[in-house]
C-alpha cells in the first residue's frame, strides 16, 4: 500500500475482516463465501457453508441485523458478530478465538498472517 494514501488504507481496513476470514478458512481447507446473498436473500459478509458459520464485522440497519440473526437461527447458522476494533493484529487474534469457539483451531504466527493478508491485498490492488 502506498504510504499516505488514505483511500487505499481505508479500503484495506474495510476489507480486512473478510480477507482474514477467507485467509484462515483457506488455511483450514474450508471454502468461504464473501458477500453472498444466496442463503438469506440479504448478503452475509462471510459465510463458511461446511461449518454453517457466518462472521460479520460491520453492522447495517438495525432491522436488517435483527432479520439476519433470525434467519440464520432458523437455518441453523451460527452468526458471530466480530467488529473491527483496534488493529488488524487485534482483529486477527479475535477472529482466531471466534474460530476456536466453534472448534476450528488455527495455530499460526498472527503477525505473519496479517502481513500475508496485507501483501495479498496490495497485489490485488496493484492488478486493478
PLM regions and their residue ranges:
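Nucleic-acid endo/exonuclease domains
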Residues: 1-128
Amino acid at each position: 500500500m502506498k504510504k499516505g494514501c488514505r483511500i487505499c488504507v481505508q479500503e484495506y481496513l474495510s476489507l480486512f475482516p473478510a480477507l482474514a476470514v477467507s485467509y484462515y478458512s483457506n488455511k483450514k481447507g474450508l471454502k468461504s463465501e464473501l458477500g453472498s446473498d444466496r442463503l438469506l436473500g440479504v448478503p452475509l459478509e462471510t459465510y463458511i457453508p461446511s461449518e454453517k458459520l457466518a462472521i460479520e464485522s460491520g453492522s447495517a440497519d438495525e432491522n436488517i441485523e435483527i432479520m439476519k440473526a433470525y434467519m440464520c437461527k432458523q437455518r441453523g447458522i451460527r452468526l458471530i458478530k466480530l467488529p473491527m476494533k483496534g488493529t488488524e493484529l487485534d482483529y486477527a487474534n479475535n477472529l482466531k478465538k471466534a474460530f476456536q469457539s466453534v472448534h476450528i483451531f488455527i495455530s499460526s504466527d498472527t503477525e505473519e498472517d496479517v502481513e500475508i493478508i496485507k501483501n495479498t491485498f496490495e497485489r490485488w490492488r496493484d492488478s486493478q
